[in-house]
């Protein structure tokens, strides 16, 4: 009598990420740098790299001035990230140059939650976010602590791409009255339900009132501005 060989037991997610260098018999020999990123995937669809200490034991020098470029280049082409929907990269000195590489990725097409807080994007980086087709699905956008001023804020407010955003956090930037007024007058951010502009030098009562009474932001339920 022929006996069917027992089927191979499928591995769970935790077993996969701890499966040596082959990661679930996929035959992929990840570099230590790639392994650190792979192990930063949470719940299969969330990439969470909250600081550069993730890479301390990999041999990759996160203090290198080119670290943001190297990280962006790897993420943009790293096949396991094709199912990622939430992208969280904070405290990694991510700048506009790195962001240009990231938004050209053919892999990261499903991002709907984007957190790039505590980096070095500046106005140029904000403009790249605003113009990137990669982010058309984003509903939650966190760009706190990035040195973004009125020009970058205007780019976000007039973006033809970020029309699905319902939650926007710009905490501790340099939005100012000018940037706040741009958001208040935004047609493209009309779906906002939550807006945090704390620590943004929004001083004038005119700007604050414009946000509170904006005929554009009719869905807004939570506004924090100080």
Feature locations, PLM:
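Short, solvent-exposed loop/turn at the beta-strand->alpha-helix junction
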Residues: 54-56, 61-73, 93-100, 120-127, ...
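Leucine-rich solenoid repeat scaffolds
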Residues: 189-226
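Conserved hydrophobic beta-strand positions in leucine-rich repeat
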Residues: 47-49, 87-89, 114-116, 138-143, ...
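Eukaryotic tandem repeat interaction scaffolds
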Residues: 117-118, 124-170, 179
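Short, positively charged, low-complexity/disordered linker segments
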Residues: 171-193
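Leucine-rich repeat
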Residues: 33-44, 73-82, 101-109, 128-136, ...
